[in-house]
Amino acid sequence: KHYEQAGANIVVYTGGTGLSNRDVTPEALAPLLDRNIPGMEEAIRSYGQERTPYSMLSRSIVGVINETLVLGLPGSTNGAKESMDAIFPAALHVFQILRGGGH
């Protein structure tokens, strides 16, 4: 929760979203999230699927804790970059909504 005290708008975790026994990022983050954002998770997988068939195996997780956007993305540099490409700049609208702005 240090990020909250620092006033972070976004926290990005990379790695641990695959299927091996040590890939536990989604399980670690899920109980901490106030709400998931399944549409952003779907956008990440869909965007990746256009580039590699293995993206369907990714378990990226997206949600919010209070007014902070939390992203659990693939650990590979390319996977993380493509995930960010998939959701930005549209993800910026999340901050407007969290601060009481319109949809």
Q: Where do the language-model regions lie?
A:
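Non-catalytic beta/alpha edge segments that cap or flank active sites
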Residues: 1-103
